[in-house]
């Protein structure tokens, strides 16, 4: 519905940055179509300025942002607040909202759309986010970096560039960056193929570990740091991929075998903690109390012990991962037997990527029809398990019709950042959502950029978004020098023992 509004010049001629609110306009009861869609989202008080533009054809746009006594008017087709303006607006709206009014001109006629709010939570978010930037392809994986972005502004820097140690046929791939308790000074990532090894940085010291050993299935893959011990649990995976010609899921990444191992960073010792040949364990994650390890596992028994690969490909739809946990004693470093947490196979689904909220109350995971690598599954959604009540539900308020996959909690447990392919089904972008004390999520918002159209023009996917308390200070060249060293081989032990 539209109605014509005519206001006096004295009441409406608001000026800011040379922009004016139009005197005469039609009024619409519809929300404006803007990109990114920041209508009625909830944001942390310390987030970088939200920029947006009209998503469609328009001759001009004017927007007024109001919070308390603060008011700013923007024009020129897009809203790009500077840092000082945005900070004043956010501080004035903390615990409340920034009111946004958008006026659009088409063919000489102005329309004022239904105002919307940007709710400003007093809950802050960790100031840094790291991720791997990679083309959504299996061909150009060498041209990738691990980057870090300050969430309080638009500053971005490279933690490590994969091409620093790649040399023609001697290619390399880096992956699986991970931190101990959001601490950027305690980090690990893997270098694969040429000069391969696991890089571990701990309070300024960097070492390269050769984790391959005859007593374990493979070198470590997906990691999780213990909250305070110098201990990392990894999955070990024999991984393959196939390409579909008809299925809407273009690529299927799968494990034919996988186990869990524990690695003592200080003693350089490794041991198996789950290696049942009929179970495929993956994606471990520590509970914040350091006394429980969560992971997912699929039961799969081969009928043909010789042609495993071909058999697995013909039975991929049978592979359903459930969620499990194991108790752990931090004093003795001993694990208890596994316990079932959520039987996804009972509803003909597959659950992966368990992540526990910092207060230990909620377990967020990714659910899809089958398989383990849900980033390639268009039906993948985020689900939440209340560990106190046992209730499990789909996070409909966060999910989209396309892929939602990897997710990371903020250190205060009030935010999650997650990977989504909601725009085009191909490129993975980071979205952020507020989670209240009842486990309810808010409408998610896209990572803000200085140019509102940046992500639609950027031809890389954001892979494995991880929040951090600050920036990684080690320079890319320092990591490159460590990668060029000989790897220190791990020692296999039947049982880890605490050093006294």
Regions flagged by a language model, labelled:
Residues 17-500:
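Sequence signature of WD/YWTD-type beta-propeller architectures
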Residues 1-23:
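Bacterial Sec-dependent N-terminal signal peptides
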């Amino acid at each position: 519905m539209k109605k014509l509004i005519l206001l006096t010049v004295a009441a409406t001629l608001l000026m800011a940055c040379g922009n004016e609110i139009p005197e005469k306009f039609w009024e619409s009861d519809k929300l404006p179509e803007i990109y990114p869609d920041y209508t009625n989202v909830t944001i942390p008080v310390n987030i970088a300025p939200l920029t947006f533009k009209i998503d469609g054809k328009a001759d001009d746009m004017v927007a007024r942002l109001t919070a308390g006594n603060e008011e700013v008017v923007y024009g020129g087709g897009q809203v790009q607040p500077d840092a000082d303006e945005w900070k004043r607006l956010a501080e004035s709206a903390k615990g409340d909202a920034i009111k946004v009014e958008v006026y659009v001109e088409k063919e000489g006629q102005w329309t004022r759309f239904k105002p919307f709010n940007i709710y400003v939570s007093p809950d802050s978010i960790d100031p840094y986010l790291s991720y791997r930037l990679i083309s959504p392809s299996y061909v150009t994986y060498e041209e990738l970096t691990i980057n870090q972005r300050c969430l309080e502004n638009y500053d971005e820097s490279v933690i490590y560039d994969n091409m620093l140690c790649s040399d023609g046929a001697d290619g390399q791939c880096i992956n699986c960056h991970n931190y101990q308790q959001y601490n950027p000074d305690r980090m690990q990532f893997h270098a694969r193929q040429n000069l391969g090894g696991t890089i571990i940085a701990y309070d300024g010291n960097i070492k390269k570990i050769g984790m391959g050993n005859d007593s374990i299935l493979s070198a470590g893959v997906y990691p999780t740091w213990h909250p305070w011990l110098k201990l990392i649990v990894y999955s070990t995976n024999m991984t393959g991929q196939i390409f579909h010609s008809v299925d809407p899921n273009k690529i299927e990444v799968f494990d034919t075998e996988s186990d869990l191992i524990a690695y003592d960073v200080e003693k350089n010792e490794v041991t198996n903690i789950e290696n049942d040949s009929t179970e495929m364990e993956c994606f471990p994650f520590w509970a914040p109390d350091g006394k429980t390890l969560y992971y997912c596992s699929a039961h799969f028994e081969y009928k043909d012990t010789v042609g495993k690969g071909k058999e697995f490909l013909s039975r991929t739809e049978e592979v359903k991962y459930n969620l499990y946990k194991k108790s752990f004693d931090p004093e003795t470093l001993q694990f208890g037997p596994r316990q079932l947490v959520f039987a996804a196979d009972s509803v003909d689904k597959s659950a992966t990527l368990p992540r526990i909220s910092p207060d230990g109350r909620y377990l967020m995971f990714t659910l899809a029809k089958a398989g383990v690598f849900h980033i390639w599954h268009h039906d993948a959604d985020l689900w939440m398990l209340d560990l106190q009540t046992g209730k499990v539900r789909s996070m409909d308020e966060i999910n989209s019709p396309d892929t939602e996959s990897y997710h990371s909690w903020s250190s205060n447990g009030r935010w999650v950042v997650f990977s989504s392919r909601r725009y085009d089904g191909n490129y993975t972008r980071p979205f952020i959502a507020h989670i209240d004390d009842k486990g309810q999520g808010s409408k998610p918002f896209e990572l803000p950029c200085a140019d509102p159209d940046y992500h639609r023009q950027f031809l890389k996917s954001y892979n494995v978004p991880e929040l951090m308390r600050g920036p990684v200070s080690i320079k890319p060249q320092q990591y490159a020098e460590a990668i060029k060293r000989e790897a220190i081989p791990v020692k296999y032990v039947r049982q880890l023992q605490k050093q006294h």
